[in-house]
């Protein structure tokens, strides 16, 4: 049974803060609360929690016996991406042929003290207009500007997220910092700057920067980008599969870009 959460005491924030997916959900709660129609939380069975945020659905702690209810709920909402734990993900993949399973790796950022020399080229408070231009070049399915700007500026104002750029050509975002656990996302470089080592230098600096504050930082990578993060020395923390809706005509709804992958 899936039921919407409308009161704060109904949301198990302790559970959310125990996993990376849960922390992402908790960060959305901290940013938006329970009042916005595009950010809705639900209970799943006795102990599960589900978040629908724009075109992404996140689920933690759901039981396999909830798969029928979840598949019906997913068909009703038609999110672009669904993230949940095994074995529920595998069961949903069988029930939802309109979705494909994509392999995703979680990398832990590794600090490199030599990266401090590039800090002079890092913009700590860049123009969000400039950031969007970089992201557009890297993510053709990026949501439209107004939606992205509204969400990003809101999360930055509330201290949930922080955006950086490097040499006006590469960008990355701290998606959340919860209990010293940091998720980095929205990593992109302008086409004309690719191959110059900007992303490599910038991410090594970001790893070093966060380590100064005793933060454990990770980022997600689908297989198409996985080799790059191995090459720069980031460590595989875990791997999983996520569900994504197969190709359709509604490109604007594709990819909330909540993690850049």
Feature roles, as predicted:
Residues 87-100, 200, 223-240:
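Conserved active-site alpha-helix within GNAT-family acetyltransferase domains
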Residues 76-86, 210-222:
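Conserved GNAT acetyl-CoA-binding A-motif
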Residues 99-110, 235-254, 258:
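Conserved catalytic-core motifs of GNAT/GCN5-like acyltransferases
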Residues 84-86, 100-114, 125-128, 133-142, ...:
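Non-catalytic substrate-recognition and accessory regions of acyl/acetyltransferase enzymes
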Residues 65-73, 189, 195-210, 231:
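Conserved acetyl-CoA-binding loop-helix of GNAT-fold acetyltransferases
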Residues 1-94, 140-147, 164, 258-261:
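N-terminal charged segments
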Residues 53-54, 143-188:
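A conserved beta-strand-loop-helix scaffold within acyl/acetyltransferase catalytic domains
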Residues 1-13, 118-133:
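A short beta-loop-alpha structural element at the N-terminal edge
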């Amino acid at each position: 049974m899936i039921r919407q959460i409308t009161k704060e005491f109904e949301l198990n924030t302790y559970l959310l803060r125990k996993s990376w997916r849960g922390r992402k959900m908790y960060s959305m709660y901290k940013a938006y609360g329970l009042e916005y129609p595009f950010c809705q939380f639900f209970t799943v069975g006795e102990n599960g929690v589900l978040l629908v945020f724009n075109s992404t659905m996140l689920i933690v702690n759901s039981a396999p016996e909830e798969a029928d209810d979840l598949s019906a709920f997913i068909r009703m909402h038609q999110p672009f991406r669904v993230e949940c734990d095994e074995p529920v993900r595998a069961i949903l993949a069988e029930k939802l042929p309109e979705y494909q399973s994509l392999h995703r790796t979680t990398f832990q950022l590794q600090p490199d003290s030599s990266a401090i020399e590039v800090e002079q080229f890092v913009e700590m408070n860049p123009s969000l207009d400039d950031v969007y231009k970089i992201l557009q070049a890297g993510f053709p399915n990026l949501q439209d500007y107004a939606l992205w700007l509204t969400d990003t500026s809101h999360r930055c104002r509330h201290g949930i997220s922080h955006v950086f750029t490097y040499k006006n050509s590469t960008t990355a975002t701290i998606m959340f910092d919860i209990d010293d656990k940091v998720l980095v996302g929205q990593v992109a470089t302008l086409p004309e700057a690719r191959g110059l080592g900007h992303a490599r230098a910038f991410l090594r600096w970001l790893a070093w920067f966060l380590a100064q504050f005793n933060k454990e930082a990770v980022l997600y990578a689908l297989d198409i980008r996985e080799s790059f993060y191995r090459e720069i020395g980031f460590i595989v923390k875990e791997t999983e599969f996520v569900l994504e809706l197969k190709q359709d005509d509604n490109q604007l709804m594709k990819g909330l870009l909540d993690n850049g992958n």
